[in-house]
A protein has these predicted regions:
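Structural core segment of the AMP-binding/adenylate-forming
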Residues: 80-146, 478-480
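Conserved AMP-binding/adenylation subdomain of ANL enzymes
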Residues: 188-224, 229-269, 284
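ANL superfamily adenylate-forming
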Residues: 30, 114-161, 176, 185-188, ...
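Conserved pre-ATP/AMP-binding loop-to-beta segment of ANL
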Residues: 22, 151-169, 176, 212-221
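Gly/Ser/Thr-rich phosphate-binding loop
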Residues: 172, 243, 265-273, 284-346, ...
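Conserved AMP-binding A3 loop
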Residues: 34-36, 165-193, 197, 201-202
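AMP-binding/adenylate-forming catalytic core of the ANL superfamily
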Residues: 92, 109, 271, 383, ...
Length: 535
């Protein structure tokens, strides 16, 4: 099911802001750009991609950088000409960026100085466009401002709803990140539906309070606190802002006190981030009560489960700021369930209710049979927003997408008698640290490359701030020694910093095993939680 009058593609979707083109759209430090300026710069980049790089419909263009306005220009330019946007994780190191570029077969890379430095020595045949830095320091690279001239119109390209729009990489239990391919219809459907449901929810009051905070209306404004390479950032922040005429304020890096100052300066009305951000910004305000954040009416979270205690505290201490939670995955374009206001306060552990019209949620057993209310099983989602496939991985696609369009999420949960979803566990061997999905197998593979390591097991342990932290227990080869510092230095060249385990135990004997001979990861996790006093 989909909306009949939905824009046919992202190119059409980007035309919404033209009715108020002079309004502010992006703010970064001392720079402010109107909707019209953003569209014109994006159109200018689109012409460069076609005229200078020969990009045509279906070609892939990758980009990776901090949350800069150029990220927005890149996404809009690429998708508007029928090419496929490949936003790569800006925390990745050189090997990881190389994998994303090679696997996606990207023809051009757009990046800032940090990313270009990490890519030195990798895929040098791919031309690069440098953002906010000196392009002459890098090979095969030109400067963004040297080649992009604003243009009032995008190049004429026919883009169909079922054409591929994006490839976003997500960590999976198999180790290597999987490229999640989504169509224009799937991507556009997500923000359109949020906007519609948000408008409806603000009109409904329970006990005198609205079910949701307004995301549109008079001078709506949000902060891009989460990375744009995640669907929470790209969809719930960026794309949703286009249809709601919302201004986006960029941060160079997350800092809760700086967020308070930006809220005061720009009169920010709502903020969406991982749960840690919501908690930290409210705690920062306790410590800095002189900063005026009265404009802030909504605090939403996604990317990881928000602790019920946080929601209860927000309701009690900040009743004027409506709490919202959402559940979705890269494979569903961040779309599945949500809850806010009184519906959330009455059941703070819920992941929300399926979004009407577009989403169906059910619980399945291992054989794929439907389960009833309050029965524990795997969460399955059927939605117009679901992805099309995993890039170059038909086997993995078929494992999670059936012929009727149901996506098996890998999350374990229940649906209560009222239809609300509760996430209880994960089937997949993944740790979610501050909203980042980390495949344990990927980290284990990197650890195994060290010559002193005989066996390694990586798992997550609870953390109040980040949700989970990475831990590892390692069995050393006979006669070998290894310190936590040496291991961290070894891994730093191979994987992103956030993937390096924060708790490490070494032992000389073998790791414990279950009856089948597999490493007893569950037991080690339980032992670690006890030892750390987290149970």
């Amino acid at each position: 099911m989909y909306f009949a009058n939905l824009p046919q593609n992202l190119r059409d979707y980007f035309q919404f802001p033209l009715i108020h083109g002079e309004w502010d759209f992006l703010a970064y430090e001392d720079e402010t750009f109107s909707y019209q300026e953003v569209l014109n710069t994006s159109a200018g980049l689109a012409h460069v991609l076609i005229d200078q790089y020969g990009i045509k419909k279906g070609d892939k263009v990758a980009f990776s950088m901090r949350n800069y306005p150029e990220w927005i220009y890149s996404y809009m330019a690429v998708t508007s000409i029928g090419a496929v946007a490949v936003p790569l994780n800006s925390w990745w190191q050189g090997e990881e960026l190389d994998y994303g570029l090679t696997h996606s077969e990207s023809s051009v890379f757009i990046g800032d100085e940090e990313r270009l430095q990490r890519l030195e020595g990798y895929v040098e045949d791919i031309p690069r466009i440098a953002v906010r830095c000196d392009a002459s320091k890098f090979t095969n690279t030109v400067g963004f401002n040297d080649v992009v001239t604003p243009n009032e119109a995008f190049p004429e390209v026919v883009v169909d709803p079922e054409d591929d729009a994006s490839i976003m990489y997500t960590s999976g239990s198999t180790g290597y990140p999987k490229g999640v391919v989504s169509t224009h219809r799937a991507v556009v459907s997500a923000p359109e539906t949020w906007a519609l449901m948000g408008q409806l929810a603000t009109q409904i009051e329970v006990d005198g309070e609205p079910l949701a905070s307004p995301i549109s209306g008079e001078n709506p404004c949000t902060i891009a606190a989460v990375p744009l390479f995640h669907v929470t950032g790209s969809h719930a922040v960026f794309l949703l802002s286009l249809v709601t005429a919302r201004k986006i304020v960029f941060m160079y890096k997350w800092d809760p006190v700086e967020a308070l100052h930006l809220i005061e300066k720009h009169k920010v009305t709502d903020m969406t981030g991982v749960p840690t951000m919501s908690a930290e910004v409210l705690q920062a305000h306790k410590d800095n009560p002189e900063i005026d954040i009265s404009s802030l009416k909504g605090l939403g979270s996604g990317g990881a489960a928000r602790p019920p205690e946080q929601i209860k505290a927000q309701e009690k201490e900040h009743p004027d700021k409506v709490a919202t939670v959402g559940y979705g995955l890269t494979e569903t374009n961040a779309h599945a369930t949500n809850a806010s206001g009184i519906t959330l306060y009455e059941r703070p552990s819920t992941a929300g209710y399926p979004t009407p019209f577009l989403n169906l949620i059910k619980i399945m057993d291992e054989e794929g049979n439907d389960l009833g209310p309050n029965e524990l099983g795997e969460v399955a989602i059927k939605s117009t927003c679901n992805f099309r496939c995993y890039l170059k991985n038909e086997e993995a696609t078929n494992e999670v997408l059936d012929s009727e369009g149901w996506f098996r999420s890998g999350d374990v949960g229940i649906i209560d008698d009222d239809g609300f979803l509760y996430i209880k566990d994960r089937i997949k061997d993944i740790v979610i640290r501050g909203g980042e999905n980390i495949a344990c197998l990927e980290i284990e593979a990197a650890i195994y490359e060290h010559p002193s390591v005989r066996e390694a097991s990586v798992f997550g342990v609870p953390d109040e701030r980040l949700g989970e932290k990475l831990a590892t227990r390692i069995s050393l080869n006979p006669g070998k020694e290894l310190t936590e510092e040496d291991l961290s230095s070894f891994l730093a060249a191979k994987i992103a910093k956030f993937k390096i385990p924060e708790y490490t135990w070494f032992q000389n004997d073998e790791l414990p095993k279950v009856a089948a001979g597999k490493i007893a990861k569950k037991q080690m996790r339980e032992d670690a939680i006890k030892e750390l006093g987290l149970g």
